[in-house]
A protein has these predicted regions:
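Generic alpha-helical structural context detector
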Residues: 71, 189, 207-210
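N-terminal glycine-rich phosphate/pyrophosphate-binding loop and immediately adjacent elements
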Residues: 3-137
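Helical element adjacent to the flavin cofactor pocket in flavoenzyme catalytic cores
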Residues: 208-220
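A short mid-domain helix/strand-loop element embedded in enzyme catalytic domains
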Residues: 69, 202-205
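Short, intrinsically disordered/low-complexity patches at protein termini
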Residues: 77-78, 146-149, 208-211
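Active-site-adjacent bridging/hinge elements
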Residues: 35-36, 204-207
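Rossmann-like flavin
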Residues: 95-203
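A short glycine/serine-rich beta->alpha loop
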Residues: 48-52, 195-196, 217-220
């Protein structure tokens, strides 16, 4: 195959498509190669016998990244992708009794948690949200700043981030300090399964996974 494009991208998954969109907006000629018969990669949808199936994820998490990419090319991610916010995000039904409707209405979450397992856990949820807002903000600054060498790993910036990320703790041990009730620990930790990890082994950084759902919502 002969191509006269300035850039050749292999794979029409989310990363390849995002690169192509940004490059094309900048005036670069781009060609994308894809082995499948459609775009999307792991997020592709395919049809069989009149039904549509998700090739991978069944919902959309943390829209801010897509919003930034689409805004950079003068588009609206929610409009062009047809994102549908879910409310509630999902319902959790506990084997030990009780349920929660996970929602971005944080005060409603506090009220539900208080009814389910008391004020101590409700206050723990407030602390969890504030803690992870800080964790997310410092993580973003850290990831958006160049790391030029080994000395950066022991810089004031790195130590400040490490203090908040607490890499010496697991997700499970971090949550146990905020939620005495095991149902709440489960509600805020099962998201590590998205990454194929156990909350007992996943670094505490990944407490942000549930936080992103409560702060930014879940979309279909």
């Amino acid at each position: 195959m002969e191509s006269h494009s300035d850039v050749l991208i292999v794979g029409a998954g989310p990363g390849g498509l995002a690169c192509a969109m940004l490059l094309a907006k900048a005036g670069v000629s781009v060609t994308i190669l894809e082995k499948s018969d459609g775009v999307g990669g792991r997020t592709r949808v395919f049809e069989k016998d009149g039904y549509k199936y998700d090739n991978g994820p069944t919902f959309f998490h943390y829209p801010e990244i897509a919003e930034e990419i689409f805004a950079a090319i003068g588009k609206d991610a929610h409009e062009d992708l047809g994102l549908i916010p879910l409310d509630p995000n999902y319902r959790l039904v506990f084997g030990a009794g009780g349920s929660l409707n996970a929602t971005t209405d944080l005060e409603d979450m506090v009220s539900q948690i208080s009814d389910l397992c008391g004020e101590e856990n409700a206050n723990g949820f407030r602390r969890y949200i504030e803690d992870n807002r800080t964790k997310m903000e410092l993580s973003k600054r850290c990831l958006n700043t160049p790391w030029r060498g080994p000395l950066d790993l022991v810089s004031r910036r790195a130590l400040r981030v490490a203090k908040v990320l607490r890499p010496w703790r697991s997700v499970a041990s971090d949550l146990a300090r905020m939620f005495p009730d095991e149902r709440m620990q489960l509600a805020m930790s099962f998201q590590t399964k998205y990454l194929g990890m156990s909350p007992f082994h996943a670094p505490s950084l990944f407490t942000i996974l549930a936080y992103l759902e409560y702060e930014h919502g879940v979309f279909h």
